[in-house]
Amino acid sequence: MLSRRRGVNTTMTTINHTSAGEQRGKKRLIHRFSWVSLLVCWLIWVLNAYDREMILRLGPVISKEFSLSPEQWGNIVALIMVALAVLDIPGSIWSDRYGSGWKRARFQVPLVLGYTALSFISGIKAISHGLTAFVLLRVGVNLGAGWGEPVGVSNTAEWWPKEKRGFALGVHHTGYPIGALLSGVVASLVLATFGEGSWRYCFLLALLVAIPLMIFWAKYSTADRINTLYQHIDSQGLTRPATQESSHVAKGEGMKTFLRTLRNRNISLTAGNTLLTQIVYMGINVVLPPYLYHVSGLSLAASAGLSIIFTLTGTLGQIIWPWLSYSFGRKRTLIVCGLWMSIGIALFYFATNMPRLIAIQLFFGLVANAVWPIYYAMASDSAEERATSTANGIITTAMFIGGGISPLLMGWLIQFGGGWENPAGYIYAFFTMAGCALLGMLLQLMTTDKTPRKAH
């Protein structure tokens, strides 16, 4: 114990030798441990997004192989996506009880390896050749992936000073549009190279990346590193995240903490907005690939590749909007993004040719992914220190419930409009999504902004 403490003090020597006057005059720095943890959590999030979004890119080819109607496909996607919501709140409570910082990082390792291994198995045709077996495996994948999301968000926040939390979560969540983009690129390449019968190959990649990444993360996440990091944060005049002791949720307190967090008006209203926004985000992912294939007449490979154009600006939006949220305020930022999203999704009505489709996707993409880190930051700002992961779990559950509702609704609307080949159903879907974004914005109007004062 003494030698470990000496190791921490030795590491901190170069930091603490700076005089108080010099510290006040110099720019506040972020420790390399924060950057490394952000990179690892970002890569985990890329894998999560890639695997989760892949089934949406493959919608037309899967529907074709199993002869599924729009409503049947919507029901299947809803079942798979709602599985994301099942374990994230109990898993978040368990994660809070296990501990924060380096302990939560260790908690991630078997979780990520578990759901990526199931995904790998779903890519083996000998095992997943039947629709039932494939769907059950994908449900298993999403049970783990949904559990892992709030854990990953909380872990990102716990390696960064509170004043920089919005930035860190914004960068972290750029992993989602990158993962979604990769899902379209890989799906297009696999279908074009190996043929439509080989679509399962797309699910083999995530585990191959996860194994070395999780081995590194298990070795890197230590008590010494987190203690060194927190001392550095103190020395920079910034606010450390909740300490391991204060953030620890005692056994038997989990449900009380959850109910108390759920009664928080800011968190519950933001969760409502999250649910409605996810109907929009999941909806465009469900609707766009079949629209491009059945209505626009593109190939299966092209429809998979061109349905992710909005992720190009989505990455940019996830950096800009969370950064602006510190000076503009979380509440105002979410209201502006909600209005932008409503307009952007309604504009798909005018996407009658390829240049318009690309331009509208790029406009919509500027806010499509931007809101998620701000939702999490809003919940983290409003939650008790020891309930950060629980608050994030509530946001995530609302998101996943919206993700389960959306495919049901979109499949029904496409079927109601005349089926896969009729553009009317897609138009109904676009305007329904625009209404959901507008309603979510109205819910956010009733919240109170608790954005921490920006550090100078």
Descriptions of predicted regions:
Residues 137-174:
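Cytoplasmic helix-loop-helix junction between adjacent transmembrane helices
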Residues 55-56, 264-318, 406-407:
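Extracytoplasmic gate region of multi-pass secondary transporters
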Residues 331-378:
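C-terminal transmembrane helical hairpin of 12-TM major facilitator-type secondary transporters
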Residues 207-237, 440-448:
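C-terminal membrane-cytosol helix-exit motif in multi-pass small-molecule transporters
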Residues 78-93, 308-320:
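Central cavity-lining transmembrane alpha-helices of secondary-active solute carriers
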Residues 113-128, 339-352:
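C-terminal ends and interior cores of transmembrane alpha-helices
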Residues 172-225:
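Helix-loop-helix hairpin linking two adjacent transmembrane segments in secondary transporters
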Residues 166-185, 398-407:
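Glycine-rich segments within core transmembrane alpha-helices of 12-TM secondary carriers
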